[in-house]
A protein has these predicted regions:
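Rossmann-fold cofactor-recognition segment
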Residues: 39-54
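Conserved NAD(P)H cofactor-binding loop of Rossmann-fold oxidoreductase domains
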Residues: 73-81
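Active-site helix of classical SDR
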Residues: 105, 142
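Conserved glycine-rich cofactor-binding loop
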Residues: 4-5
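Residue(s) in the substrate-gating loop at a strand-loop-helix junction
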Residues: 126
């Protein structure tokens, strides 16, 4: 999901090059057609908007067309800096990263349960969930939501004996359209990040922070008391 550009597309193309049957979903039909033309034998496409309830039916049809699903990867995301707490930005972020995330991750979980399949759900969250970021309030809060939702699903799976694994991918700044290819500290290359994601999924990591520099950063972030953090002039 969210595989028409950036990290999602890079990850999808790794699996496609390796010969896997891959269902590729996203909002931009023309980008989906590009992928289909590039990998005609093992790509299956569906135009899906995670903010729409109606898109669930397209997602379900795609799974049926493929003959089932073993791994679901959720890469859809939205976020912008909002100095003046722009209402449209905040609500669109929540609609995509909270409602859309819940809609499709939940749908994948229910699919695995209903079909008695051993399933794996992976998703791209962010190190932004580590602390509340004044430059992007809704974005950082939505990423923390994703962390906790996955934790709850993992507990549910264990309680009820569902064979479903979860992998939470937490990258830092990645050079993609999402950031407008701007200049940010510790910028990561999208292809390198995609390879790290595929490795994390293959090794069933529960949480994967990409890369070591961001692991170190998050370690120190967590040590900062909230009373100190809220006084710090942190910018995304």
């Amino acid at each position: 999901m969210g595989a028409t550009s950036g990290i999602g597309r890079a990850v999808a193309e790794i699996y496609l090059r390796n010969g896997h049957q891959v269902g590729v979903c996203g909002r931009r039909t023309e980008r989906l057609e590009e992928i289909k033309n590039k990998f005609p034998d093992n790509s299956h496409i569906a135009t899906v908007d995670v903010t729409s309830n109606e898109s669930i039916s397209a997602f379900s049809r795609l799974i049926e067309e493929m003959g089932g699903m073993d791994l679901y990867i959720h890469c859809s995301g939205y976020g912008r800096q909002t100095e003046n707490l722009d209402a449209d930005t905040e609500m669109q972020t929540a609609a995509t990263n909270v409602m859309g995330f819940t809609r499709f991750v939940g749908s994948a979980y229910r699919y695995f349960v209903a079909n008695s399949r051993h399933g794996h759900i992976a998703f791209i969250s962010s190190i932004a969930g580590t602390k509340g970021l004044g430059a992007s309030p809704s974005y950082s809060a939505s990423k923390r939501y994703q962390w906790i939702y996955a934790e709850a699903l993992e507990q549910m799976a264990r309680m009820r004996g569902h064979h479903i694994r979860l992998t939470d991918i937490r990258p830092g700044f990645v050079d993609t359209d999402f950031l407008g290819h701007g200049h940010y500290p510790l910028m990561l290359d999208v292809e390198s990040v995609a390879r790290s994601i595929v490795h994390a999924i293959a090794t069933s990591k529960r949480v994967a922070v990409i890369d070591w520099r961001y692991k170190l950063l998050c370690f120190f972030w967590r040590m900062i008391p909230t009373s100190v953090w809220v006084r710090m002039p942190v910018h995304s």
